[in-house]
Swiss-Prot record:
Record-linked Pfam families: Cupin_2
Organism this protein belongs to: Streptomyces glaucescens
Effect of disrupting the coding gene: Deletion mutant can still produce tetracenomycin C, but at a reduced level.
Molecular function terms from GO: transferase activity
PANTHER family: 16.7 KDA PROTEIN IN WHIE LOCUS
Keyword field: Antibiotic biosynthesis, Transferase
Protein name: Tetracenomycin polyketide synthase protein TcmJ
Length: 149
């Protein structure tokens, strides 16, 4: 990480690079989620960027973000995103915006892996407040993606 400027007492990076392979995936909600550019990894202050990979038949369980909007960009495969129970089909090179507080579930009903890049912003006041599960997660003993702290 290169330091070029200061914001108050916090050092802010002018640029920071993270290899996806260097970030351990979380399987807590289903699929494979990696929080890439985060407050803890690069000092991000306004949101964070991540990657989700879902094998055919996998899904990310329903949840919502009380403080944040979610931006999704599908780079491979196809997905069904259920937003408040309504299905939105997402194909490769399509993007979806989910406003804060909306319940959403991400499903790969296709026969090839799906890969999606997501951005969540603004940040919640504390990482543990930023995500609320609304259905049981398939791997409750697994750690959530590391965003802060």
């Amino acid at each position: 990480m290169t330091t070029a400027q200061h914001e108050g007492e916090q050092t802010v990076a002018a640029a920071a690079k993270i290899a996806m392979s260097s970030v351990a995936p979380s399987h807590r909600q289903g699929g494979s989620t990696r929080a890439l550019l985060t407050p803890s990894s690069v000092g991000a202050t306004s949101g964070f960027l991540g990657h989700i990979e879902l094998a055919p038949g996998e899904s990310v369980t329903e949840h919502y973000h009380p403080f944040s909007d979610k931006y999704l960009y599908l780079i491979e495969g196809s997905l069904v995103v259920r937003v408040n129970g309504e299905e939105v089909r997402l194909e490769r090179d399509e993007a979806l915006f989910v406003t804060r507080g909306q319940r959403h579930r991400i499903e790969n009903r296709g026969n090839v892996p799906a890969r999606v890049v997501f951005q969540i912003s603004p940040l919640a006041p504390r990482p543990e407040l930023g995500h609320v599960d609304t259905e049981p997660v398939p791997n409750p003993a697994a750690a959530p993606p590391k965003v802060g702290g």
